[in-house]
């Protein structure tokens, strides 16, 4: 905000910025984004795994970085490939990169244009009557527009104030699918609370009801409105749940309930380690991925590995049109709305709720519980939501 206020309107109509954890090197201005190398300036969300090897290749050409970051190496690689054609340089450069990245790039000789490309890390973009905008999360867009698109992996977006042009891996112009943001700017503000976390704690009852009630038909768990048929739960002899961070803890809750009701073995793996374990997966395995954003790079990689090995795949995500949602066989959306706070609250609660719903439906389909049992579980869930709401009325007394 400070930079935006200090920059006069006539200085530029194009800019990029990014706040990133100090994953490489210390916290310093030198290691901060954007990074510039020659004619290339970029910001980067993700991690370049082979940056050391690339740094050695650049050093052999007499090119040394100023910072300690993998991002500057990426900028140097793109600049090294640049001969006047931005898209050709980006294509050549990303063929050398290993890892996750979402790049927004400005070339100094084309200063009013942003080029964007991604692999693993999310990028969403929109064109409005005030220009073009791109970000890693749609929360950043909601104050500007209700419509956006998700940039596909390997596609290159060219953003100017007048338009956004997207090209696929073959250089052909691609018309992306436009998504609608169903919540408004008020959902992304504190709404009278001191902190986003406190606001989101109090939003749990509504989020839980929005997640549970559409899946309750005649008192029973039902996913037909989600397009998830009972065939997903048949011919399965093993369930694997994979996720990262808080989402993985919801998976542990799911494991407990699924094993208890369905009497089927369930393993929960942290997604960042899943690929390196050579997991035992086949066509009789159901892989459940859990991710609030639907863009968690390690979870997405785990999903792809499971699909390669023939597993059925089901994702539990909050963001429609996200990569994990698109690439899964089946999707169950949580309806938490935006979660701004770093500490997960309502997103975790609805993930647990969906895991329980999966357990109830799986057990019912396979004859492990009766309809009466299933209806009782659903009633208990709704009653629990009411109790959560009641408990939150005592927040002032417990502070």
Spell out what each predicted region is.
Residues 190, 200, 342:
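Active-site cores of enzymes that catalyze phosphoryl transfer or operate on phosphate-rich substrates
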Residues 234-383:
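Glycine-rich phosphate-binding loops that contact phosphosugars or nucleotide phosphates
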Residues 383-399:
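Accessory alpha-helical/coil subdomains and C-terminal extensions
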């Amino acid at each position: 905000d400070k930079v935006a206020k200090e920059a006069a309107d006539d200085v530029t109509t194009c800019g990029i910025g990014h706040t990133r954890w100090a994953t490489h090197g210390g916290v310093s201005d030198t290691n901060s984004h954007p990074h510039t190398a020659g004619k290339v300036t970029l910001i980067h969300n993700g991690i370049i795994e082979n940056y050391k090897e690339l740094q050695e290749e650049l050093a052999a050409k007499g090119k040394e970085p100023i910072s300690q970051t993998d991002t500057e190496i990426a900028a140097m690689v793109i600049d090294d490939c640049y001969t006047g054609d931005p898209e050709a340089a980006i294509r050549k450069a990303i063929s050398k990169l290993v890892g996750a990245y979402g790049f927004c790039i400005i070339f100094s000789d084309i200063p009013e244009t942003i080029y964007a490309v991604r692999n693993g890390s999310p990028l969403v973009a929109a064109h409005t009557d005030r220009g073009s905008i791109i970000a890693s999360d749609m929360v950043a867009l909601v104050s500007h527009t209700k419509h956006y698109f998700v940039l596909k992996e390997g596609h290159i977006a060219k953003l100017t104030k007048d338009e956004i042009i997207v090209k696929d891996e073959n250089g052909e112009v691609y018309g992306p699918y436009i998504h609608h943001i169903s919540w408004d700017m008020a959902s992304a503000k504190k709404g009278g609370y001191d902190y986003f976390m406190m606001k989101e704690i109090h939003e749990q009852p509504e989020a839980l009801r929005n997640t549970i009630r559409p899946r309750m038909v005649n008192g029973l768990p039902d996913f037909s409105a989600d397009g998830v048929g009972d065939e997903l739960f048949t011919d399965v002899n093993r369930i694997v749940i994979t996720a990262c961070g808080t989402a993985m803890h919801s998976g542990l809750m799911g494991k407990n309930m699924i094993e208890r009701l369905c009497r089927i073995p369930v393993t929960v793996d942290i997604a960042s380690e899943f690929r390196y374990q050579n997991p035992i997966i086949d066509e009789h395995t159901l892989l459940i991925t859990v991710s609030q954003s639907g863009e968690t790079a390690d979870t997405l990689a785990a999903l792809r590995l499971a699909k390669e090995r023939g597993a059925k795949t089901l994702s539990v995500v909050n963001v429609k049109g996200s990569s994990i949602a698109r690439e899964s066989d089946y999707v169950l959306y949580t309806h938490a709305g935006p979660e701004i706070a770093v500490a997960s609250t309502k997103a975790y609660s609805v993930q647990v709720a969906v895991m329980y719903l999966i357990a109830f439906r799986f057990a019912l389909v396979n004859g492990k519980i009766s309809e009466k049992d299933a209806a009782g579980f659903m009633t208990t869930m709704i009653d629990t939501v009411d109790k959560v709401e009641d408990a939150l009325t005592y927040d002032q007394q417990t502070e």
